[in-house]
Amino acid sequence: MQRRTTALYFSPTGGTRTYVRAVAAAMPHMGGEVDLTRPEERRKVHMFGADDVVVLGVPVYYGRVPEVPGLLDGLQGEETPAVLLAVYGNRLIDDALAELSDLCAARGFRPLAAGAFVAPHTFSAKVAVGRPNAGDLAAAAELGRRAAEKLSGPVRWRPSILPRPVRPTVRSASAAWPVSGLARRAADGWKAPPLPLQWLIWRRH
């Protein structure tokens, strides 16, 4: 089966988009991308079948998937393999990957692989500047290659190995800041020391 790869991302400052493209480029039959940062794209219905594979990435806000209206509402899979990315500002990803996995599974996607990657922190001009670097992008490409290898043969799906339970979402006034305001806070400055890249694979047995 020749699967078509589609890159999907919400990326106000561009870091998540860079990682998603690096992962997707290492997978076969790249079919295009959907920029969920654009409200008009979030209002559309994007349907994927069992012969597709998606690479979906979001930044981590307050340890969770961003509370953006309709962020994933237009996505619909049908047993569609998904590679999931959470991009964080060199602190912690908290429950973001687990939450993203649950949200995608509820929309018909099958999480196949997942990774957490570092990009400049949205709220600081000094944290994680210069990321992603060459090593980060090489690791992202490796994740894409290994995910593609898993899809080259029969896949036996199993429940997520991400930590549970996911903490309840706490909504606050700060969580409702406009996305454009968040994007404007990204700036250059001191380069944070690198943390070990964290990534994991849903294994095939």
PLM region descriptions:
Residues 9-10, 172:
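Short, flexible coil/turn micro-motifs enriched in small/turn-prone residues
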